[in-house]
Amino acid sequence: MGPDQEGLTYKAAGVDIDAGNELVDRIRDDVKRTMRPGVLGGLGGFGGLFEVPVDRYRRPVLVSGTDGVGTKLKLAIETGRHDGIGIDLVAMCANDVLVTGAEPLYFLDYYATGRLDVEVAAAVIRGIAEGCHQAGAALIGGETAEMPGMYAEGHYDLAGFCVGVVEKDEIIDGSRVGAGDALIALAASGPHSNGYSLIRKVLERAPEGAATEVDGQPVADLLMAPTRIYAKPVLDLIRNLPVHAMAHITGGGLPENLPRVLPEGLGAKLQPWSWPPVFRWLQQTGQIAEAEMLRTFNCGVGMVLVVPAEQADAALQRLRQTGETAWRLGEIGTHEAGAPRVQVVAA
């Protein structure tokens, strides 16, 4: 080492261990709020421990899911709205796990950035904890990675991991779906966490950008609304009424996601529904074709449930009693070769 050179430190290289410790202290109470029966140990261990609830499940099957929030994260960074993106992260994972009929048990997150901003990271993880609370899942661990030179200034990335449990003979896999079954839509809170690469292009065309008003609200509020988490109302429903299949409407919209849970030879016939104003604004501002809208966005439908036709009214009533906006979207019919598996038909 030369006479004018100082000794190197990890902090000088861009990694601040003290900031990481401060973050852990800041989020401790938020994480505690997510605790539930089954959690063993506390924050800071090398591995999160969770006891499988064999007292409530005869043949428990664990269901896992992992996801991110796509380029909605870039819009969150550009608008400085970091508190809701953590809810989005949990929702994308927990709603996927829920589709099998599984109860979310626990969640882990991965937060990566070039330089740790404790305020921003704490806001994100508060959102993750809130999402876990909504899903009924415990936040039992996570990783905060500070990697100098890997990300643009102020940028970060997120990934989430959720594990749930379902009784083996109660797994919902679509095998019981039959012609005549009813389709029930659960309302989305907005575009959720899909289609944001196209949304950002639309915003470039809007003269006022994210400050544009749609239906009396800044479009940024509508676009950054956290993804709805359906775990509690849907679990309540499947414990009381038969559900043959569920589809989480994410990337690819209804045309791509609904067929994933339908047996061969069956298709979905949807009745037209009223799209929330933000989707019509996106369509008009971006001059986006209807088919492209349906393949990119949820267009107001966050989840679809397939139930026996004779149970549709009871299912709607129960979902509405638990606070969901739900309506009859259509029905299952036979699928003719060469025709789309999902069709919007005249009422």
UniProtKB/Swiss-Prot annotation:
UniProt-recorded Gene Ontology molecular function terms: ATP binding; phosphoribosylamine-glycine ligase activity; phosphoribosylformylglycinamidine cyclo-ligase activity
Record has Membrane as a keyword: no
Protein EC: 6.3.3.1
InterPro entries, alphabetized: PurM-like_C_dom, PurM-like_C_sf, PurM-like_N, PurM-like_N_sf, PurM_cligase
Pfam family membership, one: AIRS_C
EC class name: ligase
Location of the protein in the cell: Cytoplasm
Main localization (coarse): cytoplasm
Domain of life where this protein originates: Bacteria
Pathway given in the UniProt record: Purine metabolism; IMP biosynthesis via de novo pathway; 5-amino-1-(5-phospho-D-ribosyl)imidazole from N(2)-formyl-N(1)-(5-phospho-D-ribosyl)glycinamide: step 2/2
UniProt entry keywords in alphabetical sequence: ATP-binding, Cytoplasm, Ligase, Nucleotide-binding, Purine biosynthesis
GO cellular-component term (any): cytosol
Family classification: Belongs to the AIR synthase family.
Protein name: Phosphoribosylformylglycinamidine cyclo-ligase
Upper taxonomic lineage: Bacteria, Pseudomonadati, Pseudomonadota, Gammaproteobacteria, Chromatiales
Gene that encodes it: purM
